[in-house]
Structures are given as C-alpha cells and as structure tokens.
Amino acid sequence: MSEETEDIWGIAHVHASFNNTIITITDQTGAETLAKSSGGTVVKQNRDEASPYAAMQMAEVVAEKALDRGVEGVDVRVRGPGGNLQTSPGPGAQATIRALARAGLEIGRIEDVTPTPHDGTRAPKNSGF
C-alpha cells in the first residue's frame, strides 16, 4: 500500500501599510502560525521597514521557514491599513508576492482582505481620503 502524501498548503497573510510590512504564514485554518517576519527584523532604519527591498528579504526568510515545515504552496491574503485609513496596500505587498513565488512556494489565489467600513466612525480632520 503506497500512500501519496498530500500537498501541504498554507495562507500567507501580508499586512502592508506605508510604515511597515508584516508577513505571517499559517496553516489552512489560520490557527497555527508556521512562520512570521516584519520589516524591523531585516532592516536597520525605521524608514526602510515598508520598502519593497525589506519585503523581499522578509518573504525569503518566511518562505525558507515554511518550506522547512513542508509547506508547498500558499494562498495570499493582502491587507492594507483599512477602516478610515487608506484602502490600498503599501509598497511591500507586490514585492512580497513576487519574492514568495521566487523562493519556491507555489501561489494559489491572491485576495484583498482590507477592512472596509460600512459607514463607521467619522474620518479625521484634513484627511485627504
């Protein structure tokens, strides 16, 4: 009896704001964290935490940890600041997805999970959004 091993897939949660980028890879249920990294772990200056370069470095680190745990592919969930803030993700989001694919992880579906208010609180004064 030869049993085929099932491909293990995870979810890559990418929170990309204009100040920082955070990448977390969990199992399919989202209950167990397999790997995580943020901008401050790969660059020295605070201003570089949200840069595409930092996002690529984080994605390489996270992908290596995930591949060591047997994850073969990920579904990507990109999130911007949301709420009354910007609904577009920061500059690190696109670089993260590219770097995850380059690092050897198979990319399934990519979805935007930025929270949108259904007429929530009043926006801050002088907000250009």
UniProtKB/Swiss-Prot annotation:
GO terms for biological process: translation. Pfam families: Ribosomal_S11 (PF00411). Gene3D superfamilies: Ribosomal protein S11. Belongs to the universal ribosomal protein uS11 family. Keywords: Ribonucleoprotein, Ribosomal protein, RNA-binding, rRNA-binding. One of its GO terms (cellular component) is ribosome. This is Small ribosomal subunit protein uS11. Located on the platform of the 30S subunit. The keyword rRNA-binding applies. The keyword Transmembrane helix does not apply. The gene is rps11. Part of the 30S ribosomal subunit. InterPro entries: Ribosomal_uS11, Ribosomal_uS11_archaeal, Ribosomal_uS11_CS, Ribosomal_uS11_sf. Disulfide bonds: none annotated. PANTHER family: 40S RIBOSOMAL PROTEIN S14/30S RIBOSOMAL PROTEIN S11 (PTHR11759). One of its GO terms (molecular function) is rRNA binding. It comes from Haloarcula marismortui (strain ATCC 43049 / DSM 3752 / JCM 8966 / VKM B-1809) (Halobacterium marismortui).
